[in-house]
Amino acid sequence: MKIVYNTILFTLLFLATSCDHSEKIDDIKLEISQNIFRNIDNNGGKITVAITSNSEWIIANSADWCIPDKYQGEGNDILTIKILANTKHANRQTNLIISAQGINQTIKISQQKG
């Protein structure tokens, strides 16, 4: 009986260690349709960027005058960014960073002075 038990145990261990755990994982993809928006009118407006991805993504933004319609998503999507009017007497610029599992894309936005 002990031999049968050991044989079964050995067979199970052999099968468990012989499994192929090297399943192919798709490469993470993150692309944007446009990454630079220069000299946006001082009255503000809206810009759109197409995001192409096969993963979840997030957006980091530190400018209160540049407002994305979403800060996270998954897969392909259209991002609309509202640019508020610039009433200051200086041009301004900011970067929005879109990240997906360690891959980053930067959207550079500059706006004319008021």
Q: Model-predicted segments: where are they?
A:
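Sec-dependent bacterial lipoprotein signal peptides
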Residues: M1-T17
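A short beta-strand micro-motif common to beta-rich folds, especially ectodomain repeats
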Residues: A90-G102
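Short, solvent-exposed loop/linker segments at the N-terminal edge
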Residues: R38-N43
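Interdomain boundary/hinge segments at the C-termini of tandem beta-sandwich modules
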Residues: I109-K113
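Bacterial Sec-dependent N-terminal signal peptides
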Residues: L13-F37, G114
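Surface-exposed binding patches on compact interaction domains or structured appendages
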Residues: K46, A50-T80
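Extracellular and select intracellular beta-sandwich modules with Ser/Thr-enriched
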Residues: G102-K108
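Short, surface-exposed loop/turn segments at beta-strand-coil junctions that are enriched for proline
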Residues: L84-A90
